[in-house]
Amino acid sequence: TKTFKKVDKIVGPGNAFVNESKRQVFGVAGIDLLPGPSEVMVIADESADPAFIAAALIAQAEHGSGKEKIYLVFTDSSQFEIINSEISMQIQDLSHRDLILEIFQKGFLATHVRNLEEAVSVANFVAPEHLELQVKDENISFLQNNIKTAGALLLGHYSATALGDFIAGPSHVLPTGRSSRFSSGLRIEDFFRRTSIIRYDKESLQKASQSALLFSEMEKL
């Protein structure tokens, strides 16, 4: 355009206009991914602190686009009302209280599961951007080994999504909208290209020629 010089690749997050621009130039220029509104899922067992869970859910709702997705998957049914009470209490003095309430009304889903195996199934289907495992230490390995579709796993009661976003170290440009089923977050490999190197000598060519001929005949070349 008159404003921007042509580039080979565009990376990084942005608003809906940035995403649509990246979508339209894909194929002419490379892109990393199309990260949409932020998402968090919290898997909680009976050891989880309702105050921590509430804080994690509220922190997600504070992102500000109005389209955030918040998922709570819990094994202890007695905790749900306590978590609700914690949410109500913690948002009282927040400046974005009305927006947070709207997001909880439109973008919050809580699911009670009978065990952690069911929690794994839910997580692998939703494929959330951030997945907090607020469970006993001895349950972390099972979840970590069996959940295959999450942009980032935050392990244990003290690994808040905000830490992953700001200071933990790994990229927080992560796939959303279930796209972690087939993609990963922005990483150093996104700034590299790979070229295949092929070299035969006379002897290796002779060994391979018959196989190459068979493929050629199969394709009627």
Regions found by a protein language model. Give the residues of each.
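Generic structural signal for well-ordered, non-membrane alpha-helical segments
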Residues: 18, 46, 50, 76-83, ...
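Glycine/threonine-rich helix-loop capping motifs at alpha-helix boundaries
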Residues: 21-36, 58-71, 75-102, 150-153, ...
